[in-house]
Amino acid sequence: MAQPLCEPRSESWILSPAGRQPPMPSDGNSVCSPAWSSDPWDGAQASSPAPPCARPARRAGTPGRRGTHGSRLGSGQRQSASEREKLRMRTLARALHELRRFLPPSVAPTGQNLTKIETLRLAIRYIGHLSAVLGLSEDNLRRQRHAVSPRGCPLCPDSDLAQSQSLGPRLSPAVCSGVSWGSPPAYPRPRVAAESWDPSFLYAETASQERQEMEPSPSSPLFSSDMLALLETWTPPQEWPPA
């Protein structure tokens, strides 16, 4: 019986996984090889690519979840900022509406619509008019401060000027009454005024005053009639022990 050219292949490699290769014949010169197989199922297995790994897909999905979370935070911050801006605008509109109530119809007519800038300008103009009517301008207030505090306030910017103005009238008579250094006085001065500045005269006057205070007069309460009677009846103590 003739021996076949190719050894019979086992069918176990057909049911093996896609990554496992069929067993190669031991004879290298054999013309039978898996590449020569005409089985279409075997060719489909060799040409089909390996299935992609699932792990990279999960990694790719992670940045998407982070991006979604960050977008939610950004939208929340934008919404809170818009809410704060709306609240600020409502507060400003309410304050300007309250200011509009204090403006008289002659300044702001009742049916006239005013913008925020126009309302502020009219209010400033009306306040300036009231200050002029009541005498509360800066010049009047400065005069009142000088009249109340002639010495000047240390916190006021014009305190030095006010102090110099207040001290000027006080010093002017003394300056006018004085004479130049080289010329003699126009009228003779009294001698008492000259003696009052003499040191010897001052010392003598002070000594006389002290002497008068040390010598009480009989009319003083220390030397009343009862005190004089006691002094007359008083006798000096005798020596002890007696001789």
Curated annotation (Swiss-Prot):
Disruption phenotype: Mice embryos exhibit defects in single heart tube formation, due to a delay in mesodermal migration. However, the cells eventually acquired migratory activity and gave rise to an abnormal heart tube. Mice lacking Mesp1 and Mesp2 die around 9.5 dpc. The major defect is the apparent lack of any mesodermal layer between endoderm and ectoderm and a defect in the migratory activity of mesodermal cells. It seems that a compensatory mechanism exists in which Mesp1 expression is up-regulated in the absence of Mesp2. Mesp1 may be involved in the rescue of somitogenesis in the null Mesp2 embryos. Keywords: Developmental protein, DNA-binding, Notch signaling pathway, Nucleus, Repeat, Transcription, Transcription regulation. Residues 27-36 have a biased composition (Polar residues). One of its GO terms (cellular component) is nucleus. It holds the Pfam family HLH. Induction: Expression is induced by Notch signaling. The keyword GTP-binding does not apply. GO terms for molecular function: cis-regulatory region sequence-specific DNA binding; DNA-binding transcription activator activity, RNA polymerase II-specific; DNA-binding transcription factor activity; protein dimerization activity; RNA polymerase II cis-regulatory region sequence-specific DNA binding. No expression was detected in adult tissues except the testis. Expression in the testis was regulated developmentally; expressed 2 weeks after birth, and increases, reaching the full expression level in mature testes. Residues 76-130 form the bHLH domain. It is found in: Nucleus. Disulfide bonds: none annotated. A motif (CPLCP) lies at residues 153-157. Residues 1-86, 204-228 are annotated as: Disordered. One of its GO terms (biological process) is negative regulation of canonical Wnt signaling pathway. Coiled coil: none annotated. InterPro entries: bHLH_dom, HLH_DNA-bd_sf, Mesogenin/MesP. Its main location: nucleus. The keyword Ubl conjugation does not apply. Transcription factor. Plays a role in the epithelialization of somitic mesoderm and in the development of cardiac mesoderm. Defines the rostrocaudal patterning of the somites by participating in distinct Notch pathways. This is Mesoderm posterior protein 1.
